[in-house]
Amino acid sequence: MEDTFKIGGRELTSRLFLGTGKFSSNRLIPEAVRASGAQVVTVALRRIDLEYEEENIAAYVPKDCILMPNTSGARNAQEAVRIARLARAAGCGNWVKIEVITDNRYLLPDNYETIKATEILAAEGFVVLPYMSPDLMVAKKLAEAGAAAVMPLGAPIGSNRGLRTKELVRILIDEIPLPIIVDAGLGRPSEAAEAMEMGAAAVLVNTAIATAGDPVAMARAFGLAVKAGRLAYLAGPGETQEYARASSPLTGFLRD
């Protein structure tokens, strides 16, 4: 049986979401999408240009993918809501990744403005995936507000520092009855695999792929790592032990 999961009524087979913000050329995007196997691709609304197709990043996203605009640039809930509405009016569908950031140094999300935006947009029929700093109470409020999934950061955006929030993300996986999608900071395929081994529903990767020496090869590497991590989670890793345990008997071979 195929391992799938659902968001907003859509059944997904790929657990790797792909961001598009940092590719050196838009022409790399369709190649990276195909190599990664991603079905959900995020784009910033400010990079969607309906007048000039060459500059319109959405034109490079394969038509069979779910286009998920993000509200990058929003500083409060009102701005995030406005961006989401503009994206839907521009024909980008009703999926939206909420990003509300007022911190210009660390680019950490404003969880409370994110909750407000989620509640408004979910009530308007959007499939809302909020980007948030991992916090159990905030995640519960996002679920109550109508979020379709929760997207806790692994590390600050674009840092490639890995899963620095591991224990906090684990709590969300255990306690929140929504897909948990680790977003931001994952810099290596092994880190994506680690998130999946913990039980995350999916991961979103942008910088680590887009800024790699060979973005298409790195996209494939992340796709394989996500599959490996998910398979390991389903297989059920063995327990860790404090002391060594021999895998073969230590007695009864050369002596009684």
From Swiss-Prot:
Pathway linked to the protein: Cofactor biosynthesis; thiamine diphosphate biosynthesis
EC number, as in UniProt: 2.8.1.10
Family annotation (InterPro entries): Aldolase_TIM (IPR013785), Thiazole_synthase_ThiG (IPR033983), ThiG (IPR008867)
Cellular-component GO terms for this entry: cytoplasm
Claim: Cytoplasm is one of the keywords in the record: yes
Active site: 97 (schiff-base intermediate with dxp)
Keywords carried by this UniProt record: Cytoplasm, Schiff base, Thiamine biosynthesis, Transferase
Superkingdom of the source species: Bacteria
Major subcellular site: cytoplasm
Function according to Swiss-Prot or TrEMBL: Catalyzes the rearrangement of 1-deoxy-D-xylulose 5-phosphate (DXP) to produce the thiazole phosphate moiety of thiamine. Sulfur is provided by the thiocarboxylate moiety of the carrier protein ThiS. In vitro, sulfur can be provided by H(2)S.
Subunit details: Homotetramer. Forms heterodimers with either ThiH or ThiS.
Protein known as: Thiazole synthase
